[in-house]
């Protein structure tokens, strides 16, 4: 096992009679040196990264359109992950007052959805009483969302993205009276919150739930590369009016992206939207 750790870790291993061998030290610059007996070789980190990355670039060139593979290859070293956590963050879970009732949350999913368990767990840890709601529950009328204060539309590939991302899922709401009525009644109330993640975000865009007062609504378009993009990046949270994100203003946090249709096409100027975060680099 090879890993990087502070020098204090050596004492921990010694206490447990575990033998370790130091093979190197972290460096600040671009050049690093490998020593083997009397032989000493110095390499450029940037050059080796390009060599390592080239195979991925060649494969990417066969898949990505509009020069995105070349742009990715030229820019990947300039896109450093930088984080800035809120000053009040201590890494501890919130203390939930067991004497108070938990607000009710519903995790909404469709065939082909995933990550509903992860969202349910996160909501439970945040203090919600969580229930699982499948679209068949809403379509049949078994679930009306009455008494629910928070809904979360999960990610995945609902209906295998046939006809487009979340198109079929949106249709299940639009063309089934009971599901449509349940959703409309939920958003008419003033004591509700909602979140759409990944495919759930695409769903809310398709249903025109974002800035419903606009005459022309935004859409999610295919990525410029014309292919599914998945990667880890960072976003900076701006000043915003979000109940869930306003306290994170000024922070830069890591996020996963994973979409085929992940490009927002917004018809109005930025000031017409409550954009809570932007990519930490262009």
Describe these PLM feature segments.
Residues 117-132:
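Short helix-loop-beta junction
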Residues 144-152:
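Short acidic/histidine-rich motifs immediately flanking catalytic phosphotransfer sites
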Residues 154-242:
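Cysteine-nucleophile active-site neighborhood
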Residues 23, 141-143, 180, 184-187, ...:
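Amide-donor transfer/coupling interface in amidating biosynthetic enzymes
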Residues 1, 12-38, 131-137, 218-227, ...:
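Beta-strand->loop->alpha-helix junctions that form or flank phosphate-binding loops
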